[in-house]
Amino acid sequence: MNGFCIINIDNSIEYIGCVKSVTVERSIHMSHFIDLNSDLGESFGNYTLGMDSEVLNHVTSANVACGWHAGDPLIMEATVKMCKEKGVAVGAHPGYPDLMGFGRRKMAVSPDEARAYMIYQLGALQGFCNQYDVELQHMKLHGAFYNMACVTSELADAVLDGLQAVNPNVRAMVLSGSYIAKEAERRGIPVIQEVFADRGYTEEGTLVPRTEEGAFIKDPQEALERVLMMVQEGKVVTNTGKTIDIVADSVCVHGDNPKAIAFTKYIREGLTKAGVIVANFQNR
């Protein structure tokens, strides 16, 4: 055919000649992107928890404890500074005021309390981000706060109210497919749908409770296969053997001991070998 072609904005190709024009579809290979996040800054005073400097070599986003379930002002500042030096995006990791229970115990809090908890903790970390000229990329709840906000509408609403009060541009990193994820999207809050490399899933899309069989995936190869399935196919096999749909924007990994560091490194290397681009949301 004589003539020329125009590549349209919808990725179709239109051939234009003297006699006729015809439109055909163009096949485009879309690369998969994924973020790797980890909970950091959870030391406190003289007590050291985790291997933050090591895990920062393998993740792209950090969830920084804000002083209530773990962390303190000096740890928060040091973690933000270290993230900047290593090119890792910073996120706030607010929890319940429960140092003794590491924020994993359920608490009965009112919507007003939950909203204030958010403003208090995010505001503190935002101050350190300002000090080092670092963008606060996201917010991810911790422990019981995270789990309860996934299924309790009043709590989720209060959390999002607090987030929007501090900075409406900060992304909400939330459990994929949860109530809080849907409500954040409805409000127009940027959402990061989170999945877990080392946790089992129920048919409802929630995490298998830590006390139940199948809660943890300990074999690195099995974990990698599950992560690749979630990232590339949008599916995960539950603890009953059923396959359900899931959206994966970020994968949570851990780095609180040498074995966990090796696990995280294995996941990242496996993603890269599979052609998945590992990057945070500021570097895309």
Question: What does each model-identified segment do?
Answer:
Residues 177-235:
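Active-site rim beta-loop-alpha module in soluble metabolic enzymes
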Residues 170, 264-284:
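C-terminal domain-boundary segment and adjacent tail
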Residues 53-57, 78-91, 130:
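Acidic (Asp/Glu)-rich catalytic clusters
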Residues 39, 93, 139, 253:
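Conserved, mostly hydrophobic/aromatic
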Residues 129-137, 234-245, 277-284:
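Flexible, glycine/charged-enriched surface loops at secondary-structure junctions
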Residues 99-132, 138:
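Glycine/small-residue-rich loop that forms an oxyanion/phosphate-binding "nest" at active or ligand-binding sites
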Residues 48, 52, 62-69, 100-115, ...:
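Glycine-rich tight-turn/loop motif centered on a GG-T
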